[in-house]
């Protein structure tokens, strides 16, 4: 326990972690989730969640947990909307975080006429329109980029709103 606390403090230069996720349902992930619950109860972790779990996997965690996952991180984008999973998560008050919100940079998604037309209308890039689509759909998005201009553009999403027809 002391080593774990020292690791958080020294290696991460913090006394706590904002969000800790189990990456996938592999190995003894039930025991791993219970350890995450313990860290949460000790105040070392502010929120816990899951990544790459199916609806059934999330239900398995819900059946045994004392601390409900806050978030499920999974691939979501306009070509893979995961509507049934999102409905289930909403009933459980679990948020969805869109992994690969731009569809792995799928060239076809970036050329999708509805997003291109909306981008022209709002003077936004196709990526910005897709990220706005996520926000309006209730998804948490954390797009990644090494390009400073793209990072800045990824934040410039709140001065327009897509209509129902554009979504």
Describe the predicted segments one by one.
Residues 2, 15, 102-103:
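N-terminal binding-site loop/beta-alpha segment at the start of enzyme catalytic domains
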Residues 8-15:
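Phosphate/pyrophosphate-binding loops at sites that engage ATP/ADP/AMP, CoA/4′-phosphopantetheine
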Residues 24-167:
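Beta/alpha (TIM)-barrel catalytic core signal, keyed to glycine-rich beta->alpha loops juxtaposed to Asp/Glu
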Residues 1-7:
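Short, small-residue-biased leader/transition segments that mark boundaries at the very start
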Residues 19-20:
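Acidic/hydrophobic-patterned starts of short beta strands in beta-sheet-rich repeat architectures
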